Amino acid sequence: AENNVRSTKKKVNVSVDFIESKYSRIDMSLNLVADTIGVNASYLSNIFKKEKGCSLSKYLTQTRLEQAKKYLTEYPDKTLIEIAESIGYSDVYYFSKNFKKYYGISPSKYQEERKM
Protein backbone atom coordinates (compact mmCIF):
# COMPACT_ATOMS: atom_id res chain seq x y z
CA ALA A 1 0.00 0.00 0.00
CA GLU A 2 2.86 2.38 0.80
CA ASN A 3 4.30 1.83 -2.66
CA ASN A 4 0.94 2.75 -4.11
CA VAL A 5 0.84 6.01 -2.14
CA ARG A 6 4.38 6.82 -3.25
CA SER A 7 3.54 6.08 -6.86
CA THR A 8 0.41 8.26 -6.62
CA LYS A 9 2.43 11.14 -5.14
CA LYS A 10 5.02 10.73 -7.89
CA LYS A 11 2.38 10.89 -10.62
CA VAL A 12 0.93 14.05 -9.12
CA ASN A 13 4.41 15.60 -8.76
CA VAL A 14 5.23 14.77 -12.37
CA SER A 15 1.92 16.37 -13.39
CA VAL A 16 2.74 19.50 -11.40
CA ASP A 17 6.21 19.75 -12.98
CA PHE A 18 4.70 19.33 -16.43
CA ILE A 19 2.06 22.00 -15.79
CA GLU A 20 4.60 24.42 -14.33
CA SER A 21 6.97 24.05 -17.27
CA LYS A 22 4.36 23.91 -20.06
CA TYR A 23 1.47 26.05 -18.77
CA SER A 24 1.87 28.38 -21.77
CA ARG A 25 0.66 25.68 -24.17
CA ILE A 26 -2.76 26.57 -25.54
CA ASP A 27 -3.64 22.84 -25.60
CA MET A 28 -2.70 22.28 -21.94
CA SER A 29 -5.44 20.22 -20.32
CA LEU A 30 -6.19 17.32 -18.02
CA ASN A 31 -6.18 15.00 -21.05
CA LEU A 32 -2.81 16.25 -22.27
CA VAL A 33 -1.23 15.80 -18.85
CA ALA A 34 -2.79 12.35 -18.44
CA ASP A 35 -1.58 11.25 -21.91
CA THR A 36 1.88 12.62 -21.22
CA ILE A 37 2.34 10.70 -17.99
CA GLY A 38 0.51 7.65 -19.29
CA VAL A 39 -2.55 7.45 -17.05
CA ASN A 40 -6.29 7.65 -17.46
CA ALA A 41 -7.67 11.22 -17.24
CA SER A 42 -10.33 10.50 -14.61
CA TYR A 43 -7.78 8.61 -12.48
CA LEU A 44 -5.39 11.57 -12.70
CA SER A 45 -8.22 13.96 -11.89
CA ASN A 46 -9.03 12.00 -8.72
CA ILE A 47 -5.49 11.56 -7.42
CA PHE A 48 -4.59 15.17 -8.25
CA LYS A 49 -7.54 16.55 -6.30
CA LYS A 50 -6.82 14.24 -3.33
CA GLU A 51 -3.15 15.20 -3.26
CA LYS A 52 -3.40 18.93 -4.04
CA GLY A 53 -6.82 19.82 -2.67
CA CYS A 54 -7.93 21.36 -5.96
CA SER A 55 -8.66 20.18 -9.47
CA LEU A 56 -5.91 20.00 -12.06
CA SER A 57 -7.62 22.65 -14.17
CA LYS A 58 -7.85 25.01 -11.19
CA TYR A 59 -4.16 24.40 -10.50
CA LEU A 60 -3.36 25.18 -14.13
CA THR A 61 -5.42 28.39 -13.95
CA GLN A 62 -3.67 29.47 -10.75
CA THR A 63 -0.26 28.75 -12.28
CA ARG A 64 -1.10 30.77 -15.37
CA LEU A 65 -2.54 33.70 -13.42
CA GLU A 66 0.42 33.87 -11.03
CA GLN A 67 2.64 34.08 -14.10
CA ALA A 68 0.37 36.77 -15.55
CA LYS A 69 0.87 38.88 -12.41
CA LYS A 70 4.64 38.61 -12.90
CA TYR A 71 4.40 39.59 -16.55
CA LEU A 72 2.04 42.48 -15.85
CA THR A 73 4.58 43.81 -13.35
CA GLU A 74 7.81 43.07 -15.24
CA TYR A 75 6.62 44.02 -18.74
CA PRO A 76 4.41 47.09 -18.36
CA ASP A 77 4.42 47.71 -22.12
CA LYS A 78 3.15 44.30 -23.13
CA THR A 79 -0.47 44.23 -24.24
CA LEU A 80 -3.01 42.04 -22.47
CA ILE A 81 -3.29 39.98 -25.65
CA GLU A 82 0.48 39.30 -25.62
CA ILE A 83 0.38 38.40 -21.95
CA ALA A 84 -2.68 36.18 -22.35
CA GLU A 85 -1.04 34.30 -25.23
CA SER A 86 2.26 33.93 -23.39
CA ILE A 87 0.51 32.11 -20.53
CA GLY A 88 -1.64 29.82 -22.67
CA TYR A 89 -4.89 31.75 -23.18
CA SER A 90 -6.09 32.09 -26.75
CA ASP A 91 -8.92 34.36 -25.63
CA VAL A 92 -7.96 37.64 -23.94
CA TYR A 93 -11.52 38.18 -22.69
CA TYR A 94 -11.52 34.80 -20.93
CA PHE A 95 -8.09 35.59 -19.45
CA SER A 96 -9.31 38.96 -18.12
CA LYS A 97 -12.45 37.39 -16.67
CA ASN A 98 -10.43 34.70 -14.87
CA PHE A 99 -7.88 37.21 -13.60
CA LYS A 100 -10.59 39.43 -12.17
CA LYS A 101 -12.39 36.45 -10.62
CA TYR A 102 -9.20 35.34 -8.84
CA TYR A 103 -7.74 38.68 -7.82
CA GLY A 104 -10.74 41.01 -7.68
CA ILE A 105 -9.11 43.43 -10.11
CA SER A 106 -8.87 43.50 -13.89
CA PRO A 107 -5.45 42.75 -15.41
CA SER A 108 -5.36 46.16 -17.09
CA LYS A 109 -5.98 47.93 -13.79
CA TYR A 110 -3.42 45.70 -12.08
CA GLN A 111 -0.89 46.59 -14.78
CA GLU A 112 -1.73 50.29 -14.54
CA GLU A 113 -1.20 50.34 -10.78
CA ARG A 114 2.23 48.74 -11.24
CA LYS A 115 3.29 51.50 -13.64
CA MET A 116 2.85 54.30 -11.11
For the regions a protein language model found, what residue spans apply to each?
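Hydrophobic, helix-rich cores of sensory/ligand-binding and other regulatory modules
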Residues: 1-11, 30
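Short helix-coil-helix linker/hinge
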Residues: 9-14, 54
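Basic/polar phosphate-binding segments, predominantly the helix-turn-helix DNA-binding elements
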Residues: 31-60, 84-106
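Basic, amphipathic alpha-helical hairpins
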Residues: 1-2, 16-28, 48-52, 69-78, ...
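Terminal helix-turn-helix DNA-binding modules in bacterial transcription factors
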Residues: 50-90, 112-116
